[in-house]
């Protein structure tokens, strides 16, 4: 083993520590073992660097060409300037006097304004057929404006004057097309009744408008799905052989996808094939999105994407399909394939979006050798001058949390709180940052964000602009320091955050945030600290546990805790109240509890956890769960059990 001294970190003789520059020498320990390398990732990084150099050269050539064109245009402008001056002198001799010209202009303007003022009384904000607007009258202009739209009262006015009677079907459709989709669901029944009263059948095109307006939410409940199916049945009853229009089939596929009913999606695809309809690109995109986000079936998602690529030119994947399949590969821990698809997009000149950059950054952060690359994708969003969304900022927070950069995590959440944008996800990522703090590592590393010049500026600016003084009673309870440099500070602030969520923002609490909160106690606190969090934040859901077994009320706080490092836990006084929210424990909760028991070498507590987990496995909660991740967790639990 060789010990090497160095003083080159970030700046010649300084390192970043706790938000301040301090003079230090750095000792690097170089081991004899060679580091594992990933050739495919190294080749990708090299090819990506070459690609960027080519793009820079192309950009230089483009700017040079623009400069030459500008020079030529300026020369032409100068040569034409004298010709225009000659023409102007000739025109001036035939122009009327300034007084006459002013009088004519004022007269014309006055006539035009009078005409527009009269005409504007009959021109609504939304362009609807004259046959409909004549019945509604001038009230339509005031009922539907840029600031507000009251379509229910519009229908009231229309019904008072005869409704849809004697109005052509084409005009009725044009009128309904002008109603924004979010306003349609509450008035569908009235529109159908007005058709019935006028003796006009509801056309399939209008039924499609009704169905489309019901698909705006991310998921579709069974009650809405039944309503959509009834609309489709009405179309089948009036069509030849009971077939539906292509647009209706595609809407049904999207609806069943949002209803997580893949069986019916396949049924509709089969029916389309039977009637000779080839699925369109939009249909494939909807099926792909369902496979990625609803059923989480990666294998099917890959099959759908490959079908789109090779079926025909009309179905070739665009940005949406690439985005969804990249997310699927990232979710399945295959960042290498996701990066290949990104290169494919660049080579084929497929538009790249902010969401794709975020997904790639999320995937790269899971590989130590790609952590710097993760931040490159984030800063590419700023290079493209895209306005970062809340989701993007949340994943910037996620990268900082995975890096163990607690100072940056706190600053980002503080900024989100200033605009009341703290969500369940960002709250969980803040807790993740606490649990990943570099204080837990024996040799703290420099955050990968500092490998970028943009990263250095970004981190410095956001830390300098952060103030942790509370501005109101609902402010997040940060400690008034730039960074947390001791385990006690991390325990104290995380406890304060949990108390804040309990008292002010209970919507921030779920099983993921609770498990991360427990993990902080397991890593940085004593077993007493962990037990305090374990009992106050979680509970066993006993629903469905067999009644034949006698279960005693256990009090895990009374377990003999073999901990000689601390006699008191670090907790917020607000958590001393008895009405704190508790979430049902899951497999991950018991895994963390066993780790805490293993760390403290407490056999009694580990037995208690293992026994309770047996009850949990017999509860309704676990029986009704559809997740297929339990095998790996069981293996981890058995491995930990053997260590105790």
Swiss-Prot record:
Q: Where is this region: Disordered?
A: 78-108
Cite the repeat ranges for PPR: 245-279, 280-315, 318-352
Polar residues compositional bias, start-end: 89-108
Q: What is this protein called?
A: Mitochondrial 15S rRNA processing factor CCM1
> What span is annotated as transit peptide?
1-38
* Lineage, opening ranks: Eukaryota, Fungi, Dikarya, Ascomycota, Saccharomycotina
Superkingdom is Eukaryota
| UniProt similarity note | Belongs to the CCM1 family.
* One GO cellular component term: mitochondrion
Which key words are in the record?
Answer: Mitochondrion, mRNA processing, mRNA splicing, Repeat, Transit peptide
What other facts are recorded?
Involved in mitochondrial-nuclear incompatibility, a major determinant in reproductive isolation between species, through hybrid incompatibility of Ccm1 and its interacting partner 15S rRNA between yeast species.
Q: Where in the cell is it found?
A: Mitochondrion
Q: What does this protein do?
A: Regulates mitochondrial small subunit maturation by controlling 15S rRNA 5'-end processing. Localizes to the 5' precursor of the 15S rRNA in a position that is subsequently occupied by mS47 in the mature yeast mtSSU. Uses structure and sequence-specific RNA recognition, binding to a single-stranded region of the precursor and specifically recognizing bases -6 to -1. The exchange of Ccm1 for mS47 is coupled to the irreversible removal of precursor rRNA that is accompanied by conformational changes of the mitoribosomal proteins uS5m and mS26.
Keyword Thylakoid carried by entry? no
The entry lists its GO molecular-function terms as:
mRNA binding
